[in-house]
């Protein structure tokens, strides 16, 4: 691996650490589960910085008992010598001062994903204690900290041939009051992503909290090409292997991997220095522009396909990205982030660099693989035809109704209040359950939309079919946001969208189909926390004129034990919502003071995309494998 003289001279100090414990949310976003896991990412980001600089190829993350985390790498080791101006050990400086780190010295790090020094010092400030071991220059060094302050100054504790850094800590439960328990799968998802983005490293994660420790290693020599294959694993794809494009100009490294599948949804991920740029930015704009241009240029070479297009009609960006899985990853020395969550790249020069590389390399690939380009163009042209058909249908509806969109559906029992924040809509399967819900609701704030007809699996369907589906059309009209590129979250008519289906296998299937629709066509409704699942009771238990509604088998057994097994309690299992009258439905499922609901969240869009594709796609084997591996976590009818 690369060698470099990395010492205290490379550490630059910007300001102190005082405010972190007082206002932790300013530094890690929240003190809930997201913030807790963010601490691990901050420490791992330092290891990744070492890897991107060429000094580290192995990272270990260990979850120990008692909510302790240990992160190790085999990099150069954080400097331990005395800083020339601060007159303390560089290790102490990095871990106790905000904005102290090698990232700010261009000689030490060309590009940086995490905030080297910033991240670790914040973790230190929010921990009850932290230990640091550094293997460097033939010696093992040790220091201990308490709530961000030095407790045991840096000292040599032995000789070693190793190099690297070990950071071990226990978070402060007085700050993380919601939970201090780490979720293995949440961490594994991010570590897997980092391993895909950095093909020369391996990341091992071990859970020592279990009686039999669980260990998984992520190492992907294929890098982002392998990432695309992973995302497409349950789909029929072309070309067989993803197209990989890379290039470097003005110290900006660009990598792109693309592959089409037989679906209709685009899955476009972009990263800057390993940071997921969820809001996109100039690198993504450059990619999209080049892709659309290349496709239109090649279309001219296929007259039979041109004939299928309307005159003067060109392929749009939406046409060429339907069924596309692509990853755009750039490494930028000084990224400028914009947007609401600072996850949008603003560097204008990156747009042209990505555009140029994609245009040149994709053109070359298509020239060398004419069969592949014809397959792709056939798909793009079919998508254009569907888009034009959907547009004409929408225009016809508009002329006919005099409305900008579909009118509100006839079966919708709307609420009287018009303030979206106070209103909720129950999407209910079947007219009988819809009737009970209408009778039991609070008509001031609760709207009821009964669904009828065949539910569509949007994972296998084009936009024009989705827009015209008899079951989805009323949902689109009721929510008021529009879908696809017309979507506007500000027009959402209800801030709680509650899916209410039977507590059986058919109900689970309907819930999954509806969630797939929201994820594919209205993802912001989920991201903003507006989608909920109603939790109707599974059993009603009656005894001595008393009634209990219970929601699972464990609760049923607990109530029966409480009554006494020999006391002839009557147990009714609800097969469907229609078996309850309006009063029962209100008391058990709709009364805000008593009901149980589950909010649908989207902590990781990448993994959610893969799971929806696996569960709702055409391929049977990946679905079977997923269900077998995850049966312990869900009640599935296999």
From Swiss-Prot:
Enzyme class per UniProt: isomerase
Site (Interaction with DNA): 454, 457
EC number of this enzyme: 5.6.2.2
SMART domains reported for this sequence: HATPase_c, TOP2c
Primary subcellular site in the record, as a coarse category: cytoplasm
Sequence ranges assigned to domain Toprim in this UniProt record: 423-537
Annotated binding of Mg(2+) 1, by residue: 429, 502
UniProt superkingdom: Bacteria
Any single Gene Ontology cellular-component annotation: cytoplasm
Role of this protein: A type II topoisomerase that negatively supercoils closed circular double-stranded (ds) DNA in an ATP-dependent manner to modulate DNA topology and maintain chromosomes in an underwound state. Negative supercoiling favors strand separation, and DNA replication, transcription, recombination and repair, all of which involve strand separation. Also able to catalyze the interconversion of other topological isomers of dsDNA rings, including catenanes and knotted rings. Type II topoisomerases break and join 2 DNA strands simultaneously in an ATP-dependent manner.
Note: Few gyrases are as efficient as E.coli at forming negative supercoils. Not all organisms have 2 type II topoisomerases; in organisms with a single type II topoisomerase this enzyme also has to decatenate newly replicated chromosomes.
Protein name: DNA gyrase subunit B
Organism field: Treponema denticola (strain ATCC 35405 / DSM 14222 / CIP 103919 / JCM 8153 / KCTC 15104)
Gene name tied to this protein: gyrB
